[in-house]
Amino acid sequence: MFDYESLRLIWWVLIGVLLVGFAVTDGFDMGVAALSPVIGKSDTERRIMLNTIAPHWDGNQVWLITAGGALFAAWPLVYATSFSGFYFAMYATLAALWLRPLALDYRSKIEDPKWRKTWDYALCFSGTVPPIIFGVAFGNLLQGVPFELNEFMMSKYHGTFFALLNPFALLCGVLALMLFVMQGATWLQMKTTEELHSRARNVAQITGLIAIALFIIGGFWVQSIEGYVITSTIDTFADSNPLNKEVSLQVGAWMTNFETYPAMWTAPILGVVMPLLAVIASRFERGGFAFLFSSLSNAGVILTAGFAMFPFVMPSSLNPSHSLTMWDSTASELTLGLMTGVAAVMVPVILGYTTWTYYKMFGRLDKKHIEDNDVSAY
């Protein structure tokens, strides 16, 4: 049905969609978890916050699991190289993700302030660490990752965990955290009442403005970073072999795609305008629009990074010609074809049941809801 080149492009788009879906849905879960000990001033308020995400958090995590599975199947070399290079960071992320269901399930089992406060901080950790690590990972991808391939296409990573925590990557990590917290705050503005609602509204406005500032700073910063350019001819229909190309480093090269394809400027414009609209909507008590604009903010930032790097997926700072691109590090044509058929069925199913759950379980929560469901609620 599709040729090899088209399948490669389709899966670049699909993985991008899965990452955006994760940021939009699991983003507000993590944002709420990060905010729970910050703006929840009483046990009841914190329970209200957690129960706004109770019907959705496990379903939202499907986006991340699916993205990981798609990365493994569609880009196996990228999967292997990234997990070996970001090994400690990946385990820190998984530890935080494992901690979240434990904290949600065990927090309300014992009516002891110290017990519940401990789990509140565990939830904050589970909502803060993953977005920072994801942002740091994207920041390092834009700078290049120190790996190389041998003749058997086996990757070897030459960096350290602390080398990943460079200034630009940390800026990207804080930006990701602000976007997720804004997502959580706008969600709470839609779902809560009274003082908790007001605090969430204030947080949404503050984090939105910080996100705009960080994104603009990052945009100017990336223009001074050495980007990657393919200088040889690459056969987009050939079997995957990252060693069959030449790549050079050029300062400001990540801006080339925006100059070549002006339509791509839509993404960074979204990354600046949508947080501003989210702040305005939040200020004027339009919670639904604030959440929508916050979601589009996440999409705009992710798309900006993807468009800037295209067709690179994982550049190598150690040996630029060993960089992994969407044209030479994918699975076979047969595998991509079979996966496309599966995705054509499963992605609409995921979208369908996700939409249905939000529709059926929409509404604001208040103290009365927690009191009436004291045993069953988180």
Regions found by a protein language model. Name each.
Residues 1-59, 65-69:
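N-terminal signal-anchor module of multipass membrane proteins
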Residues 9-13, 116-131, 199-212, 285-298:
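Alpha-helical transmembrane segments and their helix-start/interface "positive-inside/aromatic belt" motifs
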Residues 27-35, 98-112, 138-153, 174-196, ...:
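Juxtamembrane interface elements at the cytosolic ends of transmembrane helices
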Residues 36-49, 74-80, 101-121, 188-200, ...:
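Membrane-interfacial helix termini and the short, flexible loops that connect transmembrane helices
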Residues 56-130, 141-148, 232-236, 258-259:
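Membrane-interface helix-loop-helix modules in multi-pass inner-membrane proteins
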Residues 203-205, 209, 255-265, 327-345:
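Membrane-interface transmembrane-helix boundary segments in multi-pass integral membrane proteins
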Residues 245-250, 316-336:
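Short, membrane-exposed interhelical loops at transmembrane-helix boundaries
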